[in-house]
Amino acid sequence: MIKNTIKKLIEHSIYTTFKLLSKLPNKNLIYFESFHGKQYSDNPKALYEYLTEHSDAQLIWGVKKGYEHIFQQHNVPYVTKFSMKWFLAMPRAKAWMINTRTPDWLYKSPRTTYLQTWHGTPLKKIGLDISNVKMLGTNTQNYQDGFKKESQRWDYLVSPNPYSTSIFQNAFHVSRDKILETGYPRNDKLSHKRNDTEYINGIKTRLNIPLDKKVIMYAPTWRDDEAIREGSYQFNVNFDIEALRQALDDDYVILLRMHYLVVTRIDEHDDFVKDVSDYEDISDLYLISDALVTDYSSVMFDFGVLKRPQIFYAYDLDKYGDELRGFYMDYKKELPGPIVENQTALIDALKQIDETANEYIEARTVFYQKFCSLEDGQASQRICQTIFK
């Protein structure tokens, strides 16, 4: 009771401080934040890099305490969240470019343009479309009310395709005129670098991946009912890594990429398995991967830009589809690759990856046309020209 009261008082004081400081606007300042200040990544990063080349504005990142080293390594200007410099930056900024929800106790001035980039094409139900929220620390009503409050503050919401646009309007309670249907800025790199052998080999070299090996990335999503604490989830790899190693020859390297909400990390197995969950730019990992193994993650849509083979390891399909989230699309009919539901089927699909690639050429093309047709490498430009016209 006392703890909750103190929390509310702190939130109210932050709201009041933001409101006061917003009366001293900095019309040349743009504020960026990715995954709650833990990463230099995703759509905000792509927009930041575009603006460094095409704008004279002052660009600043908001960073969670403990993650400053990431931005120091890249020589990127930042302020630590809840520091004095942060209080003097975020509420006064001309624009916010953020890819996740922000607390409603962060006051946003009408003079600040809030661009919500979001972070994926939705396969699983999101926002107000989740009829039974099973996330730790909230319930269905509070979760949905929070989304409504948040989306009312957005001036623009980025959509990667028409499919997402139609979903976002209801799931986020946002009007069509606020949605910028442009493609995703983070996918500009995929269009620009997909055939750049020197760039791709450079990434492999940094990760100590032999240039002659096939790279398979496993990138599953998180499960709502596997929370360790509020906002943090565990994930158990549902296959035997040693069995996979024995079944595949020495020509393969497996990359494990966990969702940003998953705190579980996997032990690496010699040079066969590499945990790349902390590698900041997943676009680089797409570029070096010959194939993707996922489940219900939106990575399938980004990887679809490259039209490379995908395998869908959906070992808990019925539970996930019926009990946890539910899907917007027909999961069993619209995917650009085979669904496998156990370890044996997964290994067989990986061993026959070339045959699978040929079998699903048409499916990948149809998938690309529906979800990736806007990804022409110019999304960042389109967004910035609209916001700062």
From Swiss-Prot:
GO terms for biological process: cell wall organization; teichoic acid biosynthetic process. Disulfide bonds: none annotated. One of its GO terms (molecular function) is CDP-glycerol glycerophosphotransferase activity. It is an enzyme of class 2 (transferase). It is a peripheral membrane protein. It is found in: Cell membrane. Pathway: Cell wall biogenesis; poly(ribitol phosphate) teichoic acid biosynthesis. This is Teichoic acid glycerol-phosphate transferase. It comes from Staphylococcus aureus (strain NCTC 8325 / PS 47). The gene is tarF.
